[in-house]
Amino acid sequence: MKEWQKDRIDIIKKILPKLGENYVLKGGTALLLYYGLDRFSEDVDLDSISGNMNILNKLKTIGQNKWNMSIKKDTETVFRVMVDYGATNNYGDYPLKIEISSRNKKFLQSKIYDYKNIAGVNVYSLDEIL
């Protein structure tokens, strides 16, 4: 794994436990960090349990107001933000994309979708991800 990939994983591990109980991690990052998939995933995909998707204030606190953030999408069902924490790779600037969806809110609230809390991070079960 390249150094910039290790740095990306470290920043994701720093962010996830501080977002709180309202979010459930899904996708490639969940598979990489919590299920041992040997494949690099470079963004964070979350589902919101309550429907509150705007995490800018939490990110400002985590980044100690040093990160630049750019909202790319803000609708009733999706919130997407790019977090520039100073990372670069072979191609230049390398911001972190965080996307939150509220489309599965009712399924999460009614416990139809299975997830568990691992070290302070809600993560979908492997069956739900696959």
Predicted regions located by residue number:
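Compositionally biased terminal segments of proteins
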Residues: 1-26, 30-130
